[in-house]
Amino acid sequence: MAQRTEKEETEFKVLETLTTTTTTLCTNNCGVTANPATNNMCQKCFNASLVSAAAGVVESGSILKRSARSVNLRSSPAKVVIRPREIDAVKKRDQQIVNRCSGCRKKVGLTGFRCRCGELFCSEHRYSDRHDCSYDYKTAGREAIARENPVVKAAKMVKV
């Protein structure tokens, strides 16, 4: 009677593995089960630690930028320089905010169509022939075909 059948042995092994596994709790003592992939923290505490770590990095970076600016201001005289790139960036922001058709100035809201020339149009002016589009579709198509289908040259065969 000291021998056990295979079925009984497997049942005991399964029960042993179930009882030996222990659940670890969160390292922040919030009472939720922890995940080893998140440094033995629950998901909520792990996300909170990531946010606080990212905020610390941003704050230290902004302090460095502020100190660098103050050093530059002290060492050089104040000059006001307006760069054309900054002006273009401001104009692009203004264009993105306005939701009006560039052809008829009609409000388009969320139904506007953005053309490849960069303008926003209503349903009547969305096609390139309706708004005198400055984008060259033929050249862009040729370049795309040339990029996607490179010329393949085979090695020459040596005749014997």
Swiss-Prot record:
Binding-site residues for Zn(2+) 3, renumbered to this chain: C115, C117, H131, C133
Q: Which domain of life is it from?
A: Eukaryota
Q: Where are the zinc fingers (A20-type)?
A: 20-54
**Does Metal-binding appear among the keywords?**
yes
For the ligand (Zn(2+) 1), the binding residues are: C26, C30, C42, C45
UniProt cross-references to Gene3D superfamilies, sorted A to Z? 1.20.5.4770, AN1-like Zinc finger
Q: Which GO terms describe its biological process?
A: protein autoubiquitination; protein ubiquitination; response to osmotic stress; response to water deprivation
Family matches, as Pfam families: zf-A20, zf-AN1
Q: Which InterPro entries match?
A: AN1-like_Znf, AN1_A20_ZnFinger, Znf_A20, Znf_AN1
User: Does the keyword field hold Zinc-finger?
Assistant: yes
Q: Which GO terms describe its cellular component?
A: nucleus
Zinc fingers (AN1-type) at which residues? 95-141
Keyword annotations for this protein? Answer: Metal-binding, Zinc, Zinc-finger
Cross-referenced PANTHER family, in alphabetical order? AN1-TYPE ZINC FINGER PROTEIN, ZINC FINGER A20 AND AN1 DOMAIN-CONTAINING STRESS-ASSOCIATED PROTEIN 5
Identification of the protein by name: Zinc finger A20 and AN1 domain-containing stress-associated protein 5
